[in-house]
């Protein structure tokens, strides 16, 4: 998926009120950028980190700038959670998610009282797929989710279990945005209930999938499947 162009380089000064970030540009000026991420951005929202921001000319926007990428440990990290589903959809449609090659993709499907990211269909078979954006590393090169307690994420796991019990395929797709990651596991020390529910879901037939992205200042796309560690 192509990123907005051109992107403007700067340094993160601070992230605050969840959706705001102050960025120092190369000329020393300070701008405030929208930060489309509701998580803690642990390891990413660190003052001094190099960032790339985009600028919109839309006069109706409150903030002209948007935080797009943050450099962490020499790798660009895509913290723009609104883009994650589009990257996942592109991968699902293009066959990059091997478990669902050839399935038809419909975004945003309501199941029970939850909105699930994708409904997939193949002949008379149906599958629900929920997508999660992963930007945290634990234990060296293992990607972890979540980076904060997520009751919403817990609810999604319960919904996927309900779908599986009803005879549907169900999967949670962790989109790993850390280029150095070699595996994925739940962040049990941050949200132990999420880890418990994920293991329960897998034991009931929900598929836990992890795919790593390749990110540059011009594009981001899914390119590698990672092992999921639940032990």
UniProtKB/Swiss-Prot annotation:
Record-annotated membrane-spanning stretches: none
GO molecular function, one term: DNA binding
Disulfide bond entries: none
One family name in Pfam for this protein: SfsA
PANTHER family: SUGAR FERMENTATION STIMULATION PROTEIN A (PTHR30545:SF2)
Sequence similarity: Belongs to the SfsA family.
Protein name: Sugar fermentation stimulation protein homolog
Protein source organism: Syntrophotalea carbinolica (strain DSM 2380 / NBRC 103641 / GraBd1)
Organism phylogeny: Bacteria, Pseudomonadati, Thermodesulfobacteriota, Desulfuromonadia, Desulfuromonadales
């Amino acid at each position: 998926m192509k990123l907005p162009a051109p992107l403007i380089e700067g340094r993160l000064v601070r992230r605050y009120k969840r959706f705001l970030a102050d960025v120092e540009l190369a000329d020393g000026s300070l701008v405030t950028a929208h930060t489309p991420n509701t998580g803690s951005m642990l390891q990413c929202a660190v003052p001094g980190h190099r960032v790339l921001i985009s600028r919109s000319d839309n006069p109706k926007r409150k903030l002209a700038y948007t935080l797009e990428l943050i450099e962490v440990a020499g790798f660009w990290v895509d913290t723009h959670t609104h883009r994650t589903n589009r990257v996942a959809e592109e991968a699902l449609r293009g066959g990059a998610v091997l478990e669902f090659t050839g399935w038809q993709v419909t975004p945003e499907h309501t199941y029970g009282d939850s909105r699930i990211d994708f409904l997939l269909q193949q002949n008379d078979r149906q599958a629900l797929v929920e997508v999660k954006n992963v930007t945290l590393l634990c234990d060296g090169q293992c990607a972890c989710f979540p980076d904060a307690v997520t009751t919403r994420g817990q609810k999604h796991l319960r919904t996927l279990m309900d779908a599986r019990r009803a005879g549907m395929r169900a999967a949670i797709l962790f989109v790993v945005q850390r280029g150095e990651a070699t595996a994925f596991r739940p962040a049990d020390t941050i949200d132990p209930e999420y880890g418990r529910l994920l293991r329960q879901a897998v034991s009931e037939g929900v598929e836990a999938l992890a795919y790593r992205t390749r990110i540059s200042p011009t594009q981001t796309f899914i390119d590698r499947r990672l092992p999921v560690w639940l032990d």
